[in-house]
Amino acid sequence: MSEEKKGKILNAGKRLFLRYGYKRVSMSDIAEAAGISRPALYLVFKNKEEIFKGAYKQWVDEKIFEIEEKAETLNTAEKKLRLAFELGVIQLIEAMKTSPELKELVERNFGYGSRKFENLVERFLTPIAPRKLKKSSWTAERAAHLLVSAVPGFKQTAETSEDLRSLINDCVSLILSSWPRD
């Protein structure tokens, strides 16, 4: 199977899932949108669920890449973290409010996106993490896990996107200020 064909199918699936939702999209719809026959589609993917998961993973990977590219222009971990949470959480939650299809895509595959985002946050924290602390103390990995794990609770209590942004920014500031400078 060529990666080009697989990408074409995943892009077609992603467009259709975001437009119509999982239940209203058939394998025939995906094959037609990808410009291939239905039997050819089944040679690449066993079922619609596999395409759905693949389309979500592709979307997450693209979003992570976008954040990484934009973060390259920023000079502090705090700015990179604020950017990551703005693009990877706040804008996503805003878009999910108006798109039940996007909400379905994210919620059905939340674990993958959460792990990828947590890894991104950890990469932004690693260069500034304290190196002289005991193993059981704050690490970039633990701080990233705390930040990402706190977001669902913040989402539940925040009344507006601005409230959510403020809670996330406060948590970022709290973690960064708790680390001694080398």
Predicted segments, located by residue:
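Short coil/turn segments at alpha/beta junctions that flank glycine-rich nucleotide-binding fingerprints
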Residues: R19-K23, L74, A95
